[in-house]
Amino acid sequence: LELVLDDRIVIKGIQTDRIGTNWKFISNKLLSNNSYKLRLMSEGEGIYKSWNLKTFPSPEAQVENVSIMSFTCAGGPEGFKIAGKEFFKPFRFRQKVFDEGLSMNPDFAISIGDHIYWDLRGQNAPQIGRKNKLIKFFLGSYIGLVYGSFNRSEKASSSKNEKVLKNIGNEQIASLYGTRFKSTPIFFIPDDHDYFENDDAEK
């Protein structure tokens, strides 16, 4: 993949996964406080409509005003209810919050974790429910079937573990955010659940 800026600056993509669905683009040719039109290309063909993105002012610049959009704990799968109890907000609810914030044209956004809710509790897959062993078994088996289970004897970057990680991240991050922030720089700050555990003490 290539990222083309203003039809003149070409940035070669760097593939970061095995099958070519994750890429990063790095360039030192951009000017500070400048707006660019971006196009994503593959073998000379555009694969997404062009969009605009503005770089930050230089570190030495005297900035008079800055608008920041910030939110926390947006992670989790699509929301659902069981016996009247809500587990996570629906995607459309969270996306409405995103859209409301973006409508104010912030200069950048900060997404503070948790971005992922998938506490392993020392296992290969989440143990849903803390008391009922039957619930743990059936829901844990279902989750392992749908998303896969981590293999702790392999590296985190192994083919199997990468696939499980992407199954989780694609649902809780990629499907949630989509391309909403393509013209707004966004920084992700991890919290405890993003390391697949909750740091709260529990018996």
Specify the residue positions occupied by each region the protein language model found.
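Divalent metal-dependent phosphoesterase catalytic cores across multiple superfamilies
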Residues: 1-203
